A protein has these predicted regions:
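Glycine-rich phosphate-binding loops that contact phosphosugars or nucleotide phosphates
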Residues: 2, 9-164
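Glycine-rich beta-alpha junction loops
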Residues: 7-8, 105, 184-189
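Active-site phosphate/pyrophosphate-binding segments
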Residues: 169-205
Length: 205
C-alpha cells in the first residue's frame, strides 16, 4: 500500500480519489479531538513537550493499517516540525519505506524542532526536492510586503503526478494493471468508482 501524509497542505488531497488517480493510494491523517464545553477560561501556557503527540503517532501504527513493506510519502516543505519527523522515524522502525517531499534549500536553513536534531530530509529513505525557495512564496507583487504563491504546492503536485505516471508505466511493464479511477462526473461515474475501488481492494493495486 502507498500511504500519503502531508503536513497541512495539498499533497494528500490532490492525489486521493482523483479522476486518473490510482485507487491503491491511501491518505493518512491523524488528530486528537477533545470536547469539553466548559465556560471560557484564560488560555493556559502552551505545552511544547512532544510526549502526547508522539504517543498518538505510535497509535497510528498500532492500528495495523501501516505495515512493513508499505511505502509512506511524507510531505513537509519546511521539514522541521516534530510530528513529521517522528512519523517518518516510526514508519522506518516499522519497516516502511519512507519518501520525503520537502525543500532542501528552505529546510536546510531552519532549526529542527525534533529532539533528534534532524530534519525530514535527514531521516527518510529517499528525498524528493520540490525546490521551493526560503519562505516558499515566489511572486512579488507591488504594494505587498511579502511574496505570494507558494512554490511547494505547485512543485509537489507536479512531482507526485509524475511519479504516479512512472509507477503506472512500470507496473504495466511487469504485467500488472493498476486500478485507475474514472471521473465521477460521467453518467456512470459513481458506479465505476465503487467498482474500481472494490477491484483495488481485492488485488491490492
Amino acid at each position: 500500500v502507498i500511504h500519503i501524509f502531508d503536513s497541512g497542505h495539498m499533497v494528500s488531497s490532490e492525489l486521493i480519489h482523483r479522476a486518473g488517480g490510482l485507487a491503491a493510494l491511501s491518505g493518512l491523517s491523524f488528530k486528537l479531538d477533545i470536547t469539553n464545553p466548559v465556560r471560557t477560561r484564560p488560555a493556559a501556557p502552551p505545552d511544547t513537550s512532544p510526549g502526547l503527540s508522539y504517543r498518538y503517532i505510535e497509535h497510528v501504527f498500532e492500528t495495523d493499517q501501516l505495515r512493513a513493506g508499505d511505502v509512506l510519502f511524507v510531505g513537509s516543505v519546511s521539514g522541521k516540525t516534530p510530528n513529521v519527523i517522528e512519523l517518518a522515524l516510526q514508519a522506518k522502525a516499522h519497516g516502511l519505506t519512507v519518501i520525503g517531499l520537502t525543500s532542501l534549500a528552505y529546510s536546510s536553513q531552519l532549526e529542527p524542532m525534533h529532539p533528534s536534531g534532524k530534519r525530514l530530509y535527514e531521516v527518510v529513505d529517499l528525498v524528493l526536492d520540490n525546490h521551493a525557495p526560503y519562505g516558499d512564496a515566489i511572486l512579488e507583487v507591488d504594494g505587498l510586503d511579502y511574496k505570494i504563491c507558494p512554490a511547494s504546492g505547485m512543485g509537489a503536485a507536479s512531482i507526485m503526478w509524475a511519479i504516479m505516471a512512472g509507477l503506472v508505466e512500470e507496473m504495466l511493464a511487469r504485467g500488472l494493471k493498476p486500478s485507475v479511477y474514472p471521473s465521477i462526473n460521467r453518467p456512470d461515474g459513481w458506479k465505476l468508482l465503487n467498482q474500481i475501488y472494490a477491484e483495488a481492494l481485492e488485488k491490492g493495486y
